[in-house]
Amino acid sequence: MASFGWKRKIGEKVSKVTSQQFEAEAADEKDVVDNDEGNWLHAIKRRKEILLEGCAEKSKQLKDEGASLAENKRYREAIQKWDEALQLTPNDATLYEMKSQVLMSLHEMFPAVHAAEMAVQQNPHSWESWQTLGRAQLGLGEIILAIRSFQVALHIYPMNPEIWKEDLSWARTLQEQQKVAQRIKKSEAPAEVTHFSPKSIPDYDFESDEIVAVCAAIAEKEKTVSANKTMVIVSASGAIETVTEKEDGATPPDGSVFIKAR
């Protein structure tokens, strides 16, 4: 009679050498998969680098073309080239700064300020961008903001004589002229009309007995004066006589003898 026992696992029938062979093959396949995945990621990264290099190269080409057009005063075409370059390299502060200069040459101050602000935003350590921003702000009449921008540019590059002698000096001169003009305007302004506050006017009680009595006396006096009419009568001989005529219709002297004048 056969004795009862646990069933052996199938794997136990496989020899140790065969098992090791399977494990080695599985490890090789895993290495191949890992290598393929690594190669794929590397290829994507390399392709991205190539695209970025191509964009940067194309952007530089467009930048140079725009600069050449701007030197020949073909400003609109230069702006178009730089806009195309910004599509490829939107973080290039130099493109915004150059665009701002050209817009100032076209007397388009609001877009010039906006472009200079974008240049400062992309590269706040660029003294050229701050200098251009200050000049654009001067074009808008924002003297205080322009002075601040020039001061930032000097803080970045303190040895720049152009900012000291031209930009900042000119901005401060304009500021002094503005202050003088404001003082003159203020001195020539007409005197303001004095406005009385309600508290400065006495609050009379027009229904008091005293006010009513005064009004009644004035009315009675006017009534008495109007009841009498005064006439100046000039006689034919030239004599002048003043006659008071009553309201009851008193008859004046004969008109054939006197000439009546009122």
Curated annotation (Swiss-Prot):
Gene3D superfamilies: Tetratricopeptide repeat domain (1.25.40.10). The modification Phosphoserine is found at residue 197. The keyword Lyase does not apply. The modification Phosphothreonine is found at residue 251. PROSITE patterns: TPR, TPR_REGION. SUPFAM superfamilies: TPR-like. Keywords: Phosphoprotein, Repeat, TPR repeat. The keyword Phosphoprotein applies. TPR repeats lie at residues 59-92, 93-126, 127-160. It comes from the Eukaryota. This is Tetratricopeptide repeat protein 33. It comes from Homo sapiens (Human).
